A protein has these predicted regions:
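Short active-site loop at a secondary-structure junction
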Residues: 58-66, 88-153, 203-214, 296-299
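N-terminal leader/targeting segments and the immediately adjacent pre-domain N-terminus
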Residues: 2-6, 11-92, 98, 114-121, ...
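Extracytoplasmic/secreted proteins, especially bacterial periplasmic and envelope-associated proteins
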Residues: 44, 48-55, 102, 107-111, ...
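Short, surface-exposed loop or secondary-structure junction motifs
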Residues: 85, 139-362
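Short, solvent-exposed turn/loop segments enriched in Gly/Ser/Thr/Pro and often Arg
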Residues: 71, 104, 127, 252-258
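Catalytic loop of the DD-peptidase/beta-lactamase superfamily, centered on the K-T-G motif
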Residues: 38-79, 224, 236-237, 272-429
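Conserved beta-strand positions that form and line the central face of beta-propeller blades
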Residues: 80, 91, 99, 126-130, ...
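Short secondary-structure boundary/capping elements
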Residues: 48, 92, 184-188, 368
């Protein structure tokens, strides 16, 4: 580990807490061409990753980012770039907490697969009887096909819910419609399940893929019903505490937690109507336009990229306590059998995206909510990285934004001439 200023190399400082970018002369490394500070630690030869993140931030006007990079289970880089809070000039650090968005879904999938591994459920069990037993399901679902929704369908986003057709119940305007129909405020995950089952499905379960927050809300309740514990308690005790040394931390809809970054709407974004039961005012989109509290199984997790990286490396035992056995890993990375899609080489397995090749699999998940974009990736070459940004562009530019992130980090990995030895995990708890 080395310290060099104005060269793209990082400092060796790993003190927890927020630091002022104004103290750069003492504490932070600067890239003069970008004007952005960076703080954290890395082993030699990884400057291409600094350049990659800073270029994405500059191109898309992102205030802050945090990155953790590993190879073969060893942490090689943990850094923050730019600002966690621009107004206060507080630097993003490796210890800065960020919302992880839909990366949370991978945690939920691992929990479900472990319950199946332990004989507590079967992936082809129907979910409706569980919800009926728990008093969540309506007395008579509107669509008879609801009885055919299986746990496996929900894991693979083929449960019959398509937000492109019927809207996403976790965001407005459908969130507000559910509050009115169900007579609840704020809108809970249980209310969303009940309302979804009182509507016609968008397609027959198992027919095709359609990314669905509703499905993972349902899986969170399956975990609670089968385990007999709350989602947060079960995830903390069985999965997070043994791997990252602390339990599930949940975001707040209306403010950042202590040690958490501030989130920024895209430049020029107007204020949004507050979500039912969250805010009666017009608000910046990251703070009150939706309810994070009802997303525990699909997008409420706050953590550092290093912590999420530890979790991803533990799934197959590359580092730390192994979370899933071989059979569960095969289920996680198996192609879904979908009537209209055949067997593609790129697909969504159970809680992860997979690209299959003759040399092995790459698997990952992304997260995107107002004010944030995240990516967690494992590759067949042994590389792994988790990155979080505290803003995202307007809707029309988001696909290009993610493409730029993905290409920049792959380009950085390919530009490393010699991967260093050593492991920084001990310095980055």
């Amino acid at each position: 580990m080395h310290t060099t200023r104005s060269s793209g190399a990082s400092t060796s400082l790993t003190t927890p807490g927020r630091l002022l970018c104004a103290l750069a002369g003492v504490l932070l490394a600067w890239l003069p061409q970008s004007g952005l500070c960076q703080q954290g630690s890395s082993l030699p030869n990884l400057e291409p990753f600094d350049k990659a993140v800073l270029e994405v931030m500059r191109k898309h006007d992102i205030p802050g980012a945090s990155l953790a990079v590993a190879k073969d289970g060893r942490l090689l880089l943990a850094k923050g770039y730019g600002y966690a809070d621009k107004d206060k000039q507080e630097a993003m650090t490796p210890q800065t907490l960020t919302r992880m968005g839909s990366i949370n879904k991978t945690l939920t999938a691992v929990m479900v697969l472990k319950l199946a591994e332990d004989g507590k459920l079967k992936l082809d069990d129907p979910v409706l009887p569980l919800f009926e037993k728990a008093g969540i399901a309506p007395a008579s679902p509107a669509d008879p096909r609801a009885k055919d929704i299986r746990i496996r369908h929900l894991l693979q986003h083929s449960g019959g819910f398509d937000r492109e057709r019927s809207g996403d119940p976790f965001f407005q305007p459908r969130l507000r419609e559910i509050a009115r129909r169900q007579g609840v405020s704020p809108v809970s995950c249980d209310a969303i399940i009940r309302d979804s089952l009182q509507e016609k499905l968008d397609f027959t379960p198992g027919e095709r893929f359609a990314y669905s927050n509703t499905g993972y809300c349902m899986l969170g309740r399956v975990v609670e019903i089968v385990s007999g514990e709350s989602y947060r308690a079960f995830s903390s005790r069985e999965f997070l505490q043994p791997v990252i040394g602390k339990g599930f931390q949940a975001a707040s809809s209306t403010e950042s937690r202590p040690g958490e970054t501030k989130y920024y709407p895209f430049p020029g974004e107007p204020l949004q109507r507050g979500a039912p039961g969250v805010s009666n005012a017009n608000v910046p989109s990251p703070y009150g336009s939706y309810s994070v509290e009802n997303m525990d199984a699909l997008g409420a997790w706050i953590a550092t990229p290093t912590e999420v990286l530890k979790f991803f490396l533990a799934i197959d035992g590359t580092r730390g306590k192994r979370l899933l056995n071989d059979e569960s890993l095969r289920a996680m990375r198996s192609e879904p059998v979908l009537a209209k899609e055949g067997n593609p080489r790129a697909f969504y397995g159970a809680g992860i995206h997979v690209v299959r090749s003759d040399k092995g699999d790459n698997w990952w998940h992304t997260g995107s909510q107002p004010g944030l974009q995240t990516l967690a990736l494992r590759t067949r070459q042994g590389y792994a990285w988790v990155v979080a940004f505290n803003s995202r562009p307007e809707h029309a530019e988001r696909r290009a934004f993610f493409k730029d992130i993905d290409q920049a980090l792959w380009g950085a990995a390919n530009a490393v001439k010699e991967w260093p030895q050593g492991d920084l995990f001990a310095n980055n708890p």
